[in-house]
Amino acid sequence: MLRTTIFAALLAFCVTSIMAQTQFAHTQGKEIVDGAGKPLLLRGTNLGNWLVPEGYMWHLNNGGPESPREIEALITELIGPQRTRDFWHSYRENYITQADIHLIKQCGFNSIRVPLHYKFFESDDAEGFTLLNRVVQWAGQENLYVILDMHAAPGGQTGSNIDDSDGYPWLFSDASAQEHTVAVWQRLARHYRDNSTVLGYDLLNEPIPNYPGLERFNASLEPFYKRLATAIRQVDKHHILILGGAQWDTNFAVFGPPFDNNVVYTFHRYHAPADQTTVQPYVDFRDRYNVPIWLGESGENADDWIAKFVAVLEKNDIGWAFWPYKKMQATTSVVSFPAPEGWDAIIQFSKQPRATSEGAARLKVRPEQPVIDGALAGILNNIPSSKCRENQGYIHVLLPSSTLPTESK
């Protein structure tokens, strides 16, 4: 009887352990599979411009602010520190809501990639967790997977506008930035370790650009990934680790054999030929190491190019997440929001030289305060999904079987 009881207890423990392990999406050879072991081809969109704003998605590029800190500086100049804090709080609360996640599901996507800025996850009770928890909860209700993407790491992994850095990828040579990044990722992993809606962790977005002299950091990339993996695995044994190549997530030559048994390799391709030549190097890598690959970003192109590239990806069983879900007044996103009245004046002002000595000249072309206030209020009014336009052509080339109506709003 005692043996039977012990055996039953051990069996229950083993079954529970197996269930705990397999409720999470994981890798199986060259495939990502769901908790039941069924192959999972990711079809997703990126929630860009939410926690990591980019100037071009506000039509502020071509001489205007591009990075989050530059956009924040512009708005602070226009409305002052306190109102700027209020603006961004409202922006983050309303840019991505439950209605957006529901629409993503309605379109036919099965996953979302969420670009993160480290500054929102500096403590367990930080604002970022409040915002991200809601998105993960809503995604779970819609049976969508969530990929967490470190888009802006401490010190900067690219040294460009997209990582909100000081203009140089200090992450690869600054010990304090590395320690900081490890701590942020371990905090995120500890927080989401038991959440199976979260599919995995995209450890660094587009590290090390192809700028002159920066290739010397390539040799540091995989060792730092190993360091991050060690820290994450101390608190989270379940989630997939997603590793991007050097030079904007294009160069897989930096990788040796996989160092973790639950890892996916991600590549990004923009404005490349929409044919087999673009994906073949990554397919070869997949075959060489028997690991899954995933396209974490692409897009910003004509609908016919996107249709051709999606066909190539799916022919090769490569999951994808196109960029982005939402931005201002554009057709190359799932939805777009209208530019508010007075925004052209803000754009023109944003392009004026910002040197201290140019202060008087800037004041001469500064819009009147009512115009400024109206334009920024218009941004907040226009970003909710109810005010956005669905780009039906874009949606239907990504997801030809989408059940959304083909006519535009």
Walk through the language-model features, giving the residues of each.
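Bacterial N-terminal signal peptides
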Residues: A8-V15
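Positively charged n-region of N-terminal signal peptides that target proteins for export
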Residues: M1-T4
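Aromatic-rich peripheral "rim/lid" segments of glycoside hydrolase catalytic domains that contact
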Residues: W305-K409
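Extracellular glycoside hydrolase catalytic/binding regions
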Residues: F24-A25, E179-M328, T332-S350
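Boundary at the C-terminal end of the N-terminal hydrophobic targeting segment
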Residues: I18-T22
